[in-house]
Amino acid sequence: MFLKKAMLIIDRGSREPEVREELGAICEVVKKKGGYDFTDYCFLEVLPPFIEEGIKRCVSENVDTITVMPYFLYPGMKLKESVKKCARLCHEMRIKVIFTKPLSYHFILQNLLIERIEDLKSKMNISSLNADCDILVIGHGSSDKGARTAFEYTVNGIVPFYKSVNFCFLELDRPNIEEGVRNIVGKGTGLLIVVPYFLHKGAHTKKDVREELYSALEKYRLKEAHITEHLGADVKLVNLILERAREAESNIV
């Protein structure tokens, strides 16, 4: 008997239209490459479609199972809240659900950081060797210790390739962005390349990170600094989603 399957990607949520565009693009490629009968996304908070609506959309397509991808870079509080809420709703609706692992702890994320840096160097015609570049990776930050551990795992993976690799957080953890810039200045900086470790072009990447960063750069009089693009709707993330899905689905009898 042929079983119909859906993939539902749960994101934190954002008011920025670019976030919906990126998630829509990812869902489209996931459906094609993963062989799903239906793919969609929903949000934990901020704006609809919320999780309940996302599940109902899948159910309306008469699928037999829903594979749920908690689309988070860290195993923090928001991820746990998403899984708990989705599990409860699926139980109430009597629909079979399979949860994947989040995106964290995978070499693809390290490759994406390197790719964003190389893209920037190419775009800006930067000829400096990687051995002369100081990298500052900016994460969101979380009160969950597991989130920090996962973030540091990814950042540490690119340490061998650059003059120095440093990290800081937008909020909820230390060092903050100003402290991150100060730490680099204190060690003697080469060419500074800043990587915003965010999935989407949301309010944080468009405004918050840049405001904090530019303020710190001005304070410490750093004139030669460049900021890369965020992670975005990259096919590498699609491949990671599908790998996580296969891992989870293969464990179900």
Stretches found by the model and what they are:
Residues 1-253:
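Active-site-proximal alpha-helix that buttresses catalytic centers in soluble enzyme cores
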